[in-house]
């Protein structure tokens, strides 16, 4: 891991020699598996809809870590522009994959940059929502009741929001063309899954769910319907 400084006048990044950080497919697989299992331990998918949600999230992780440690497709496709704009950068170093820090002029190790720190907050917050949502949802399912306690008293879909926050965090930390393309598709998918879930809840709980739906926001805590 190397440090760099950025001349804000010339916009060139000065690097120490670095070893190419790609081609590590085993490391990519291990990281994708660790985060997928971490999410699985919190989410615990049971229904077909749960597995669709978890599968989409897992595919995002695979695409992300394949570029982070395997093959830098985004940097390869943008190499002409990147090399002409930042000729002093070793774009095959791991640090260079933190594109937001690189392009916006962060002066220091990108792992301590503002976007990297923000990504940890988003990822951590997302996993907390997924975990807290599961605790309440599982207890309600065991009693065949509507989940309205805990985090569900503030949000109707905390777990879907959690997945979106985790994906947002990874996108901020390590943006790639593939994950940028996948992100809006997956967000729309989660919104549709939430609507599908609500139709089933209305069918099962009737006016109780309609009252809950009218008083508790779906994804944004301070927004009311």
Q: Which residues does each PLM region occupy?
A:
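Membrane-anchoring alpha-helices and their flanking helix-loop junctions
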Residues: 1-145, 166-200, 204-207, 211-225
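Histidine-centered phosphotransfer motif of kinases
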Residues: 154-161
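Intracellular coupling helices
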Residues: 145-152
